[in-house]
């Protein structure tokens, strides 16, 4: 009496369920339960694969760390080029002037 789920109690419960629902309905319910278990296992497997794919993608993102290069606007670059060009032009004039003085 201490154990509620003894084998004899389970058999009696199964017989009552069989009588109430009928043989066809019980087999249909068991089929539905089996389909549910299969669908659950399939979804768990797909979820595991998605998790593995995400982990692989995160590994790739760590290895391909691309940093953007800083660039200056064109107006700043052109101004810098003009300064360089004008200073070399001035240096050229100065060297020509020195040569002429030396003569």
UniProtKB/Swiss-Prot annotation:
It is found in: Cell inner membrane. It holds the Pfam family TatA_B_E. It is a single-pass membrane protein. The chain crosses the membrane at residues 1-21. It comes from the Bacteria. GO terms for molecular function: protein transmembrane transporter activity. Keywords: Cell inner membrane, Cell membrane, Membrane, Protein transport, Translocation, Transmembrane, Transmembrane helix, Transport. The keyword Cell inner membrane applies. Residues 60-103 are annotated as: Disordered. The Tat system comprises two distinct complexes: a TatABC complex, containing multiple copies of TatA, TatB and TatC subunits, and a separate TatA complex, containing only TatA subunits. Substrates initially bind to the TatABC complex, which probably triggers association of the separate TatA complex to form the active translocon. Part of the twin-arginine translocation (Tat) system that transports large folded proteins containing a characteristic twin-arginine motif in their signal peptide across membranes. TatA could form the protein-conducting channel of the Tat system. Belongs to the TatA/E family. This is Sec-independent protein translocase protein TatA. It comes from Bartonella quintana (strain Toulouse).
